[in-house]
């Protein structure tokens, strides 16, 4: 029981989205990140799937609540409701499919319109292991990311390459924005919550200041 309690102790909770066309490997990326293995029997997501994981980002423990959204158009009205209050997102395309790359602008527009106004997005060119079938060059996607102020990585849900790094980079940037004051976890719709560990740190100075004030009055 003690180990379970310790494993659930975290400083911050971030709401994440995984968005992009159907067939880009979004569910496989989520499964690889959480389970550290490839999801062989992956079917198209119907509606929304959910996963969570606690990661260590520069000494802070961050719990990611990750919503994997369906990429098919018929589910868009359902999945859009989950965008609200997301702090971060993985915007995924398939490097072997020009069609999934061409759809990125629509997904990006939705994310920036419906999620937190300060949402941090990383572009992920998935299926890096299928380089021989590539239809989208690294340079082209890199330019798209730069033009739209996105971070960018190519990933492989099959081999695990850059999968954890994608989530880590996104979480690290959010954490940096909190520490610089650009993001306020207490603002409604930020997609960020303080965890128990952070709340204890926020309260502890008040407890230590009270006795010293009394001592001064004596």
Swiss-Prot record:
<feature type="binding site">
    <location>
        <position position="26"/>
    </location>
    <ligand>
        <name>GTP</name>
    </ligand>
</feature>
<keyword id="KW-0449">Lipoprotein</keyword>
<dbReference type="GO" id="GO:0030672">
    <property type="term" value="C:synaptic vesicle membrane"/>
</dbReference>
<feature type="lipid moiety-binding region" description="S-geranylgeranyl cysteine">
    <location>
        <position position="216"/>
    </location>
</feature>
<keyword id="KW-0472">Membrane</keyword>
<dbReference type="GO" id="GO:0070062">
    <property type="term" value="C:extracellular exosome"/>
</dbReference>
<feature type="lipid moiety-binding region" description="S-geranylgeranyl cysteine">
    <location>
        <position position="218"/>
    </location>
</feature>
<comment type="similarity">
    <text>Belongs to the small GTPase superfamily. Rab family.</text>
</comment>
<feature type="binding site">
    <location>
        <position position="27"/>
    </location>
    <ligand>
        <name>Mg(2+)</name>
    </ligand>
</feature>
<dbReference type="GO" id="GO:0055037">
    <property type="term" value="C:recycling endosome"/>
</dbReference>
<dbReference type="GO" id="GO:0019882">
    <property type="term" value="P:antigen processing and presentation"/>
</dbReference>
<feature type="binding site">
    <location>
        <position position="129"/>
    </location>
    <ligand>
        <name>GTP</name>
    </ligand>
</feature>
<feature type="short sequence motif" description="Switch 1">
    <location>
        <begin position="44"/>
        <end position="49"/>
    </location>
</feature>
<dbReference type="GO" id="GO:0031901">
    <property type="term" value="C:early endosome membrane"/>
</dbReference>
<feature type="binding site">
    <location>
        <position position="27"/>
    </location>
    <ligand>
        <name>GTP</name>
    </ligand>
</feature>
<dbReference type="InterPro" id="IPR027417">
    <property type="entry name" value="P-loop_NTPase"/>
</dbReference>
<feature type="modified residue" description="Phosphoserine">
    <location>
        <position position="190"/>
    </location>
</feature>
<feature type="binding site">
    <location>
        <position position="126"/>
    </location>
    <ligand>
        <name>GTP</name>
    </ligand>
</feature>
<dbReference type="GO" id="GO:0003925">
    <property type="term" value="F:G protein activity"/>
</dbReference>
<dbReference type="GO" id="GO:0001671">
    <property type="term" value="F:ATPase activator activity"/>
</dbReference>
<keyword id="KW-0488">Methylation</keyword>
<dbReference type="GO" id="GO:0032482">
    <property type="term" value="P:Rab protein signal transduction"/>
</dbReference>
<dbReference type="GO" id="GO:0016192">
    <property type="term" value="P:vesicle-mediated transport"/>
</dbReference>
<keyword id="KW-0963">Cytoplasm</keyword>
<keyword id="KW-0653">Protein transport</keyword>
<dbReference type="GO" id="GO:0099003">
    <property type="term" value="P:vesicle-mediated transport in synapse"/>
</dbReference>
<dbReference type="InterPro" id="IPR001806">
    <property type="entry name" value="Small_GTPase"/>
</dbReference>
<comment type="function">
    <text>The small GTPases Rab are key regulators of intracellular membrane trafficking, from the formation of transport vesicles to their fusion with membranes. Rabs cycle between an inactive GDP-bound form and an active GTP-bound form that is able to recruit to membranes different sets of downstream effectors directly responsible for vesicle formation, movement, tethering and fusion. RAB4A is involved in protein transport. Also plays a role in vesicular traffic. Mediates VEGFR2 endosomal trafficking to enhance VEGFR2 signaling.</text>
</comment>
<dbReference type="InterPro" id="IPR041819">
    <property type="entry name" value="Rab4"/>
</dbReference>
<protein>
    <recommendedName>
        <fullName>Ras-related protein Rab-4A</fullName>
        <ecNumber>3.6.5.2</ecNumber>
    </recommendedName>
</protein>
<feature type="binding site">
    <location>
        <position position="45"/>
    </location>
    <ligand>
        <name>GTP</name>
    </ligand>
</feature>
<dbReference type="GO" id="GO:0030100">
    <property type="term" value="P:regulation of endocytosis"/>
</dbReference>
<keyword id="KW-0597">Phosphoprotein</keyword>
<dbReference type="GO" id="GO:0019905">
    <property type="term" value="F:syntaxin binding"/>
</dbReference>
<feature type="binding site">
    <location>
        <position position="28"/>
    </location>
    <ligand>
        <name>GTP</name>
    </ligand>
</feature>
<feature type="binding site">
    <location>
        <position position="42"/>
    </location>
    <ligand>
        <name>GTP</name>
    </ligand>
</feature>
<feature type="binding site">
    <location>
        <position position="25"/>
    </location>
    <ligand>
        <name>GTP</name>
    </ligand>
</feature>
<feature type="binding site">
    <location>
        <position position="68"/>
    </location>
    <ligand>
        <name>Mg(2+)</name>
    </ligand>
</feature>
<keyword id="KW-0460">Magnesium</keyword>
<feature type="modified residue" description="Cysteine methyl ester">
    <location>
        <position position="218"/>
    </location>
</feature>
<feature type="binding site">
    <location>
        <position position="158"/>
    </location>
    <ligand>
        <name>GTP</name>
    </ligand>
</feature>
<feature type="binding site">
    <location>
        <position position="45"/>
    </location>
    <ligand>
        <name>Mg(2+)</name>
    </ligand>
</feature>
């Amino acid at each position: 029981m003690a180990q379970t309690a310790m494993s659930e102790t975290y400083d911050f909770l971030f709401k994440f989205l995984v968005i992009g066309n159907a067939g880009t490997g979004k569910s496989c990326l989520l499964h690889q990140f959480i389970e550290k293995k490839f999801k062989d029997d992956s079917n198209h997501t119907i509606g929304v799937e959910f996963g969570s994981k606690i990661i260590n980002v520069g000494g802070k423990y961050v719990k990611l609540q990750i919503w994997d959204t369906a990429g098919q158009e018929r589910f868009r009205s359902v999945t859009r409701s989950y965008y609200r209050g997301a702090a971060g997102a993985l915007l995924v395309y398939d490097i072997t499919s020009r069609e999934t790359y061409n759809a990125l602008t629509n997904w990006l527009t939705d994310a920036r319109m419906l999620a937190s106004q300060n949402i941090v997005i990383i572009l992920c060119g998935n299926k890096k292991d299928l380089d021989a079938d590539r239809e989208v060059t690294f340079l082209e996607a890199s330019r798209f990311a730069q033009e739209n102020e996105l971070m960018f990585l190519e990933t492989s849900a099959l081999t695990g390459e850059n999968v954890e790094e994608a989530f880590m980079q996104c979480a690290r940037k959010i954490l940096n924005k909190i520490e610089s004051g650009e993001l306020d976890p207490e603002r409604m719709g930020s997609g960020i919550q303080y965890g128990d560990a952070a709340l204890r740190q926020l309260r502890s100075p008040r407890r230590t200041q009270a006795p010293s004030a009394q001592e001064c009055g004596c």
